[in-house]
Amino acid sequence: MSKKPKVGMWSGLTAVTAVLTAGAIVGTTVAFHYTTTVNNYLDADTYKIIKGDSDEDTEYFKSDFTSDEERESYEAELCAQVEAEGAALLKNDNNALPLASGAKVSLFGHGSVDLMYGGTGSGSVDTSKAPNFKQALEDQGIQVNSTLWDLYSSDDMMKNYSRITPAAISDTLEANTQYAVNEAPWSKLSSAESSFADYGDAAIVVFSRSGGEGADLPSGENGTNDSWIKGQEGDGNYLALSAEEKELLQNLKTLKDNGTFKKIIVLINSSNAIEMDFLNPEICGEDYGIDSAMWIGDVGQTGINGVAQLLAGEATPSGSLVDSYLYDNMANPAMYNFYTQAYPNAADYNLLTDGPDVQGMYSVYQEGIYLDYRYYETRYEDAVMGTGNAGDYNWSTTVAFPFGYGDSYTTFEYSDFNVTESADAFNVTLKVTNTGSTYSGKETVQLYFQSPYTDYDKANGIEKASAELCGFAKTDILAPGASETVNITVDKSELRTYDANNAKTYIVDAGDYYFTVAGSAHEAMNN
């Protein structure tokens, strides 16, 4: 008679132990990845301070503040100042801004009640104590349409027409693809329409977009992807206005034409470059009647106070764009490479599974230095001069607002431009005068240079831009008629170019180098 193997407690324990071991491995991995989140939730102490017997002062970095409250107050004021000096005025027809004292305005767009305060990842912002747009405007004496504000803030609107943004650094690739503008259709505003006339000094529209670390913008092959969500009427282009946003502008234009609203002001609440075709009727084919537009970026914890100061005229815009803004982002060749591509053999090595550490994707970087204004302005020069390989290129129908652009409520004049050379640097001085008659303000002075493009450069494939920013400075607040001498120092190393193919080091070509001050990269090219 054969013996039966003994199965019982030990085999059961083995199975249980195996399951527990697997669970412990998985749990440890997950817990390690979310260490900060878990510790914060459990209110766990992760360090201990042990004081020694020495009398040595170990506080090496002394605070300038006597209390946390004093520090927080300073930070709040600084954030507002950074926003007020960083926002860029894009257009201001008929001096639509600033608003008159005590103006009564209506705020439109879901972004007006749900601002982009910060980005994702390390760029996120604690909004628990952040002022909202209505509060900020009222602090400046501007009256806000409460009926419309309450409608946009209602549970129904917040539930059904809120911006959809993926959680940063999600566990799943799918979660990182869910984007939607999700602007409320005009019909949803009908219950507040009777209040518009009483708050008709201006219709202020806020267009917001999100995107950043761990929550990259929707992209697909050749720059678009119809599977990404854009809104109720999407074509895959998250950085263009949605159908509902265009409908909003169309109806506001009708109300402006019949006298309900005196002016339409648009605020671009995004650190990602939204397409600007809607600001130019000749480009988009429709006149939305927009009087003024301002780029405010992500406003930070208290930066919306700075925006309100600009709208009320308490501050004068002096910011400059740090990107070129296009009518159509597909005019940027880099867009054709900016999409998720998988290595051909990624699946063989299990590199396409969901998770925060997926390593199966790549992007092609083939533009060299020719990104943003270095591309647009270099191709512009080639097109004008008939050099290079510019092809059929029209700068004016491509670039809406160039790198460095930013208007003001006043005007400035430059004079007495002078360049002196030392052993290691060039020193540039010029006089800046506020030539306006009403508003005080600051001026951002931008210094650009152009280096010679030699036969050696061409033979060795050396990349050079037609204009390069090499320095900048901002004046103090200048009253009408006041002047200030600005000084900008440029280290000579800034003029170097990398020779990757022959010398394999930085070189400085012999020839003529030109410096110019300008209000944008494009203005520099035309100086």
Model-flagged regions — what are they?
Residues 1-527:
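C-terminal non-catalytic regions of proteins with extracellular/luminal or membrane-system context
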